[in-house]
């Protein structure tokens, strides 16, 4: 028996080392507010695969699904309360957590600018205080919103039209006399098909992911605001990570964000694809277009400051040009 003692001691030591190594790896649960077939989500799944490939022994991410796992407008609350660790969403989908989430649509400075001008730190201060969240990275930007319609208009007037919205568009569309209704993205196709809505607000891209081009006749130009889709994390979970895990996750999130110039060329290709699918452009004249975009901005900031008197003006300093 004495002869085997060193072997047993060695085996015990190796087992202990293995246990310590396993303890240093953590698996985080991520849910998407967007349907799994959307291009946003496919890009994020590629990012998750990269995180997991390089993060063995440090950090892994488990994608638990899209709105079928947690409904679109409940993802923010799920992140806030720790039901999930990371959410992939846009701020308009979690204004039920904090009104400031929707202000990010007004960004004229880039995510890179905001990391330099204090914007990223301010966002994280607000998100931590009001949402128990860490704002990891913005991974969609440089992307305008548009109005898509099945009925032609010749001026910025939506009188008599039923338009699907999220908080992104509510006040702006109402200022043009639209009848507005809020639905999750997954419900829009059926609403168009049944004539429940006459149009919707949406970015320049991602119609084809959801087959909305089949039920869409017109896109109104110019675009307005700036689509924002981000990775948000439960703050308690973020703080519980080791320094090495936090550094790794932050580094990978920043690398994902650094790819955002991709959206500039992608949006051009999507506009061309829409034209090829038969979606016609309704273009206002130069003077009307200028007033239209300025009105969207004016209404956006007025409502942002009304909703958040404390942080609205501070965000304006770092988001607006």
Positions of PLM-derived features:
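Secondary-structure junction/capping motif
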Residues: 5, 38, 98, 117-122
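N-terminal signal peptide c-region/cleavage motif recognized by signal peptidases
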Residues: 16-23
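Absolute protein N-terminus
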Residues: 1, 23-24
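Bacterial N-terminal signal peptides that target proteins for export
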Residues: 1-10
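N-terminal secretory/targeting leader peptides
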Residues: 10, 24-113, 128-321
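Hinge/lid segment of periplasmic solute-binding proteins
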Residues: 118-132
């Amino acid at each position: 028996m004495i002869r085997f003692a060193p072997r047993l001691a060695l085996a015990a030591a190796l087992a202990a080392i293995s246990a310590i190594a396993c303890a240093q790896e953590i698996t985080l649960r991520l849910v998407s507010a967007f349907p799994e077939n959307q291009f946003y989500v496919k890009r994020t799944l590629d990012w998750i695969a990269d995180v997991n490939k390089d993060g063995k022994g440090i950090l892994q991410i488990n994608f638990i699904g899209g709105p079928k796992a947690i409904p679109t407008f409940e993802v923010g609350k799920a992140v806030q309360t720790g039901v999930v660790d990371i959410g992939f969403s846009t701020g308009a989908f979690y204004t039920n957590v904090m009104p400031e989430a929707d202000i990010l649509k007004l960004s004229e400075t880039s995510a890179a600018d905001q990391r330099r001008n204090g914007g990223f730190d301010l966002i994280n201060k607000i998100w931590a205080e009001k949402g128990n969240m860490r704002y990891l990275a913005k991974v969609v930007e440089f992307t305008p919103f548009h109005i898509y319609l099945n009925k032609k208009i010749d001026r910025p007037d939506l009188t008599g039209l039923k338009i699907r919205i999220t908080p992104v568009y509510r006040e702006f569309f109402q200022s043009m006399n639209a009848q507005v209704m809020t639905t999750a993205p997954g419900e829009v196709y059926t609403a168009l098909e049944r004539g429940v809505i006459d149009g919707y607000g949406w970015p320049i891209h991602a119609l084809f992911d959801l087959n909305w081009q089949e039920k869409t006749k017109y896109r109104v130009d110019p675009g307005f605001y700036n689509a924002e889709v981000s990775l948000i994390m439960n703050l308690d979970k973020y703080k519980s990570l080791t320094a090495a895990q936090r550094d790794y996750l932050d580094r990978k999130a920043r690398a994902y964000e650094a790819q955002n110039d991709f959206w500039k060329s992608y949006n051009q290709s999507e506009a061309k694809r829409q034209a090829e699918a038969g979606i016609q452009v309704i273009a206002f004249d130069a003077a009307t277009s200028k007033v239209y975009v300025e009105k969207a901005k004016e209404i956006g900031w007025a409502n942002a400051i009304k909703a958040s008197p404390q942080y609205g003006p501070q965000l304006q300093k770092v988001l607006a040009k």
